[in-house]
Amino acid sequence: MRKLTMLLGLLISSFAAIGADMFNGADNFYKSDKVTQQKVTFKNQYQMNVTGNLFIPKGINQNAKNPAIVVGHPMGAVKEQSSNLYAQKLAEQGFVTLAIDLSFWGESEGKPGHLIAPEIYSDDFSAAVDYLSTQRYVDAEKIGVLGICGSGSFVISAAKIDPRMKAIATVSMYDMGSAARNGLNHTFTLEQRKALIKSAAEQRLVEFKGGEIAYIPGTVNKLDESTPAIQREFFDFYRTERGGYTPQGEKEALTTKPMLSSMGKFMNFYPFNDIETISPRPMLFITGDQAHSKEFSEDAYKRAGQPKELYIVPNAGHVDLYDRTDLIPFTKLTSFFKDNLK
């Protein structure tokens, strides 16, 4: 276990982040007075209940067909972290929006919690499209998707096989497959990757025999002098009043931490393969110029077919675009979806 901890620490510390004034403009728990909110539940194709927050602009004509957007939260987070903010801001611009909890996270179904399951995560977005398509005030031909952080890779995976997603946007995207296999900037060796896979397989057997579940470190619960910059960036969001949120029935210390035994599923996740087949549906990749995750948006943009756009936000890091309303380009997102969901 000590060797595993060292390997996971190396993976995390390979992610270099640039420090920023994290709290300036941060508004994760924003509450709009221009939209209504209701909790909804629907089933994915695995017959698992997916829970989301549905936001509808006040005064919208519910006898008309309106454009809609599904919003996905960062990996390890829940809908109350970042995605509710984006969903409300976009709903203020006239879209019906739906911020979902991915299966095994938050209020959505899935046992054991925090299981890594990218195929199911991707299906959750298609299930959200199913749900929106049945609402009388939504135009089923005008539904877009937006994925933040890890959900960026899940919406791309979903959009490749779901043409009902008419416009695809990502913000601070992580390719969760590449991040697990290679670390950032491909700093993880094949031997280290194999060691992690071996540890995950061994832990799977432990759990099969009734042993305790082990978790990938996720966001640290406290800082010390040795804490890597990337962890400090996430800590400033997930472990402070800025963005910290513990779903009912969960332990705060375990939030953001996926199950180790399911790690191999990310190793076998290649969301950018065949990304060009999404064309001619438009894609928008938003990243910060200081984001440690910028390589993933650049890679996706390079591989994607037309029409596509890479939009780089000046002076923004990865987590800045979770909640810093002074940096998040809501005007750009609004114009992208209005232009392509009409």
Model-derived segments and their meaning:
Residues 22-64, 322:
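N-terminal cap/lid segment of alpha/beta-hydrolase-fold proteins
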Residues 316-319, 323-342:
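Catalytic active-site module of serine/aspartate enzymes centered on a nucleophile-bearing elbow/loop
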Residues 304-319:
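Catalytic histidine neighborhood in serine/cysteine hydrolases
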Residues 156-240:
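Alpha/beta-hydrolase-fold enzymes
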